[in-house]
Amino acid sequence: MTSVPAVVLGATGYVGGELLRLIAAHPHFDLAAAVSESRAGEPVSKTFPHLGAACGDTPFAAHGAWLDGIPANSPLALFSAAPHGASAAMIANILEQAQARGIAAHTVDVSADFRYRDAAAYEAVYGGSHGAPQLLGDFVCAVPEHLAGTDTQHVAHPGCFATAILLAAVPLLQSGFVAPELFVTGITGSTGSGRTPQAGTHHPERHSNLYAYKALDHRHTPEIVNLAETASGTHARVNFVPHSGPFARGIFATVQAKATGKVSTGQLREFFESRYSDSPFVRIVDGSPKLKNVVASNMAEIGIAQSGDTVVVMSAIDNLVKGAAGGAMQWMNRLFGQPETAGLTALPPGWT
């Protein structure tokens, strides 16, 4: 396959940096532009020194300054890690210009802007007007493992919490073994709060600390409900309590439900293994998943437990990779007809 130019919008954030890292190791995508208005002209390596060997003196590009460098009638892999509320309008502008030049663009948006089917649903959760409501029908949103294929050119990646929870919840709801009400605890690392320190999210507050926030009111909850129903066919009530953990990367989610009849851990595990038998990035484990087994990789670990009528499914992912940049790369591989694992086979370091 001829190399495909790849562009990252919002390239100075943590997810943007992970996308740059993954593109650098990809066999078929070549970085054409790392877009950041605030740092245009600065070397990528100034913001991300660890990417210096891959990016060299490559500068960040300003919005609108890079598209002329993409040859007419060529393909384009467009990744957006731009902020919620800004991503949609940026994507719409680029796609309009690309279409005029015959550029065949596929888009994967990691922001929330295209996770909902209609503008009103998005605006109810995130506030403000949607930046490109005319494009909502052109996007599909799903965890890669929960949608076998799509005929759309553009994909919205679910949020990091949503990804971790859906990997556990969707097969559980599909199994028919449990009532359609889920009780969910999720613990996330500090990178999930972005690069800008805030009173409750930066290191001195989180180190040696653990606390819940937005209990039963997190904005990923309606997203989880919607995507779980789409993937499983079951509308479930989701009671979600997120927590801030004292670590940088990773999400550990625990999903509990009540069994509707007699069921064993073995039956549950067999169902999950069948459901994810063709999913190279999902591993069903004995006992509990562990963050160190997945951090810095695109892997997800899932563990299952059962006692009486209580069923528990646990999942662990890297919030920046499987929950964002890696999942986005999975989707982009599929949109371009590449092996799903291309550029994503690096093993987790284990000792971080």
Language-model-detected regions and their locations in the chain:
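Conserved active-site and cofactor/substrate-binding residues in soluble primary-metabolism enzymes
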Residues: 14, 138, 160-167, 215-223, ...
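A short coil-to-beta-strand element that immediately follows conserved catalytic motifs
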Residues: 31, 180-184, 235-239, 281-285, ...
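N-terminal Rossmann-like NAD(P) cofactor-binding subdomain of oxidoreductases
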Residues: 1-209, 213-215, 303-307, 341, ...
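C-terminal active-site/capping subdomain that shapes the small-molecule cofactor and substrate pocket
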Residues: 253-352
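C-terminal substrate-binding/catalytic lobe of Rossmann-fold NAD(P)-dependent dehydrogenases
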Residues: 216-284
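Predominant activation on well-ordered alpha-helical scaffold segments within soluble catalytic domains
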Residues: 20, 166-173, 221-225, 269, ...
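Short beta-strand or tight-loop elements
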Residues: 139, 236, 298-300
